[in-house]
Amino acid sequence: LGERNFPAGSIRLCASERSWGRVLAVNGTELTVEQATPRLLREVDIAFIAAGSDVSREMAPLAVEQGCVVVDKSSAFRMDPDVPLVVPEVNAGDISSHGGIIANPNCSTIQMVVALNPLHQVSPIKRIVVSTYQAVSGTGAAAIEELRQQTAQMMDGREADITPQTY
């Protein structure tokens, strides 16, 4: 936001309980991380949520109820037909159809559609097949712990307890 000179009268940082009270520098100003409460959200125009799907599913509707527009980085709303999935360089106009929440695709999708959009404008692309390999850390602490346990099991010569799932 600082690099783009985004017009912000004030910035509030909110996070999970483990980060409350932490002090972070934003645009040369030290800000204390706070708990996201309905009262705080009433004072906010735009809430950027980048804390995982569970947090987004809980906090985004609460923020919208308090009058915020939510830009969500998680996968929570990406497949919701009522929530625009926006890459500003490609479909910024879709922002106007939001009902309070604007979803953001995952990082590999963003760079792919930014690169493909000019080609699509000249010759419409009908289908793309893509495989990506994502870091487990992007899924959160529970997934990192699961990978640690599976690695330990395999290093001990045991079969790893693996439950396939989509993150």
Q: Would you name each region that the model predicts?
A:
Residues 1-167:
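N-terminal Rossmann-like NAD(P) cofactor-binding subdomain of oxidoreductases
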